[in-house]
């Protein structure tokens, strides 16, 4: 008695069709399909940007460096 029979489902579908009509339901399904396509396209765009690696930066250890400032007071001062 707690489960819905086939007659319950037929009545529910009939009420939905009467309230929304054929045109609104098909428009709604078209909007849902368009949203799914847009979502999938967004996922594919994200994957394309994720696949593109950043350029590798190399460090040249033998490159000349700028002269470091020299300290003139080498010793410690006693107080």
UniProtKB/Swiss-Prot annotation:
Keywords (A to Z) from UniProt: Cell inner membrane, Cell membrane, Membrane, Protein transport, Translocation, Transmembrane, Transmembrane helix, Transport
Predominant subcellular localization, coarse grouping: membrane
Biased composition, class Basic and acidic residues, residue ranges: 43-60
Gene Ontology terms describing biological process: protein transport by the Tat complex
Species assigned in the record: Rhodopseudomonas palustris (strain BisB5)
One example GO MF annotation: protein transmembrane transporter activity
Membrane topology reported for the UniProt record: Single-pass membrane protein
Protein name: Sec-independent protein translocase protein TatA
Its job: Part of the twin-arginine translocation (Tat) system that transports large folded proteins containing a characteristic twin-arginine motif in their signal peptide across membranes. TatA could form the protein-conducting channel of the Tat system.
Gene3D superfamilies: 1.20.5.3310
Subunit structure, as described in the record: The Tat system comprises two distinct complexes: a TatABC complex, containing multiple copies of TatA, TatB and TatC subunits, and a separate TatA complex, containing only TatA subunits. Substrates initially bind to the TatABC complex, which probably triggers association of the separate TatA complex to form the active translocon.
Protein's cellular compartments: Cell inner membrane
Transmembrane segments: 1-21
Family membership: Belongs to the TatA/E family.
Spans annotated as Disordered: 43-79
CC terms in the record's Gene Ontology section: TAT protein transport complex
Record carries keyword Transport: yes
Gene name of this polypeptide: tatA
Domain of life (superkingdom): Bacteria
Pfam families associated with the record: TatA_B_E (PF02416)
């Amino acid at each position: 008695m707690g489960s819905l029979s086939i007659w319950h489902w037929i009545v529910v579908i009939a009420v939905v069709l009467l309230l929304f009509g054929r045109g609104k339901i098909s428009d709604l399904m078209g909007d849902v399909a368009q949203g799914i396509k847009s979502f999938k396209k967004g996922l594919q765009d994200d994957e394309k940007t994720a696949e593109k690696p950043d350029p590798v930066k190399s460090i040249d250890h033998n490159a000349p460096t700028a002269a470091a400032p020299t300290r003139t007071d080498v010793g410690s001062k006693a107080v």
